[in-house]
From Swiss-Prot:
Expressed in shoots and roots. Also expressed in callus, leaves, panicles, sheaths and stems. One of its GO terms (molecular function) is porin activity. PANTHER family: GH26960P-RELATED (PTHR11743:SF70), VOLTAGE-DEPENDENT ANION-SELECTIVE CHANNEL (PTHR11743). Its main location: mitochondrion. It comes from the Eukaryota. Forms a channel through the mitochondrial outer membrane that allows diffusion of small hydrophilic molecules. The channel adopts an open conformation at low or zero membrane potential and a closed conformation at potentials above 30-40 mV. The open state has a weak anion selectivity whereas the closed state is cation-selective. Keywords: Ion transport, Membrane, Mitochondrion, Mitochondrion outer membrane, Porin, Transmembrane, Transmembrane beta strand, Transport. It holds the Pfam family Porin_3. One of its GO terms (cellular component) is mitochondrial outer membrane. This is Mitochondrial outer membrane protein porin 1. Induction: Not induced by osmotic stress.
Amino acid sequence: MVGPGLYPEIGKKARDLLYRDYQTDHKFTLTTYTSNGVAITATSTKKADLIFGEIQSQIKNKNITVDVKANSDSNVVTTVTVDELTPGLKSILSFAVPDQRSGKFELQYSHDYAGVSASIGLTASPVVNLSSVFGTKALAVGADVSLDTATGNLTKYNAGLSFSNDDLIASLNLNNKGDSLTASYYHIVNHSATAVGAELTHSFSSNENSLTFGTQHTLDPLTVVKARFNNSGKASALLQHEWRPKSVWTISAEVDTKAIDKSSKVGIAVALKP
């Protein structure tokens, strides 16, 4: 269904170009499938001298998907998703063990001219979240609001505006209860394999600005290179290659140009799927 999408999709294309797949850790992911179709994914991540592990199992039956994740911190998160309850409607139930206050139920509805999401925490005094986007794929406006029913206070209220055409997506977001304004831009250069993007954020309370800009180029259908730079002087680069179907390795590096004598950070990620 073609429409404006849900609220988190405002500015997502620029965020993906600037931040997605960049990392300074070492990460290995292996996915296997059992004979009855259950997908099992094991992930190991090394951060400094610490190693974190996670194992995920996913079961799909028609329009129902069940995800169970367990990590090395002894947390178990279960998510049950039911697609197309009616055309355009999705329901999501999630809860974690041992966190008894983590339960949440969410409904998402996508239409040609609207995208609405409503969620409620499964507690005695839950937090209720409502986000909506109205418009078309070319021009849309949206809002995202959370209410703490225990105090009656709004814990979050954001607003966003998005404009897009065949090769350009621009967005404007008012975040942090109106304290920060973010403008983002994504552009495919001359309908080529190269895209550029930028994100500028202004904080009204501190009167500070942050700017990140970057580019992405598809060398061939299996290889992508990316680079970015921000106003704090940090430069990053990334090379990603799909060396076999669904199996990808990624190498990324970051250097602080204001402290060039310090060692740069290098991250490696390998994801294997049969």
